[in-house]
C-alpha cells in the first residue's frame, strides 16, 4: 500500500497533473494536488518529504532536495555512442540476435531502452504504481521524440509483480529468449559490505529506496532467478563487480567490467 503523497504542479502543467492524479488514483495511489509558482531548488529544500512533481518536463519524484525522473530522452547521447560490440550488456544478452527479452526488474528503464535501441524486443515488468507511472510518462515522451520514437514499438510495459508475471508465463508455457535481472537489493560484496556507487547513482537509489523500502514485501531477486530459468534459455543478472551471486548460484558465464559484471545462466534444453 502506497502512502498518500503530495503532487506539486506548476500552473502551466496543471492540466497534465490532474491527468496524472486520475491515473495514480486508478492504481490506488492517493495524491493531494498543490499548485505552486516554481518547482526550483529552494522549493525542494523546503519540502523534503517524498513527493511527486509535474512541470513542463513531465512527472518526477522529489525528496530531500533531490529529484528523480526516468528521462529516456537524456539517454540519447549514450545511445548514439552504443554498439553491439561496445556494450557488454549487448554481448551478455545476445542482442545481435534481436531476442525477445523480459526485464523483470525494470527500475528506470535505461538498460531496457538501450537493449531495445540495439535490437531487442523488450517487456518491462514493474509492480510499483508510482514507478510504473513514471515509466509510462518516459515512454510517452519518447514516442514523440524524433530520435527515440521508432524504437518504442520494441518496448512494452507491464504493470504487475514480476514474480507473478513470470509464474503466469511458466503456467502458460510462454518462453522467451532472455530474462534480464538487475535487483535493487542487496548490493553487498562477498564480505557483506555495502558496495559504493557513483554520486548520481546514489541520489537516484536514495529516492528509489524511499519509494521502495527494503522490507519483507520487496522481492530481492533471489526468488526470481529459479523462476526465470524455467522460462528463458538465457538469464542475465547485472551485479556490482564484487557482489555475491544471486541466489548463491554460480553462473555459467560472466562478462566483467570495471564497475559491474553480468552473470549468465543458460538452459540448453530450451
Swiss-Prot record:
It is an enzyme of class 2 (transferase). Its EC number is 2.1.1.242. GO terms for cellular component: cytoplasm. GO terms for molecular function: rRNA (guanine-N2-)-methyltransferase activity. It is found in: Cytoplasm. S-adenosyl-L-methionine binds at residues 126-127, 182. Disulfide bonds: none annotated. The keyword Protease does not apply. Gene3D superfamilies: Vaccinia Virus protein VP39 (3.40.50.150). Pfam families: SAM_MT. The keyword NAD does not apply. CDD domains: AdoMet_MTases. Keywords: Cytoplasm, Methyltransferase, rRNA processing, S-adenosyl-L-methionine, Transferase. It catalyses: guanosine(1516) in 16S rRNA + S-adenosyl-L-methionine = N(2)-methylguanosine(1516) in 16S rRNA + S-adenosyl-L-homocysteine + H(+). Belongs to the methyltransferase superfamily. RsmJ family. PANTHER family: RIBOSOMAL RNA SMALL SUBUNIT METHYLTRANSFERASE J (PTHR36112:SF1). Specifically methylates the guanosine in position 1516 of 16S rRNA. This is Ribosomal RNA small subunit methyltransferase J. It comes from Acinetobacter baylyi (strain ATCC 33305 / BD413 / ADP1).
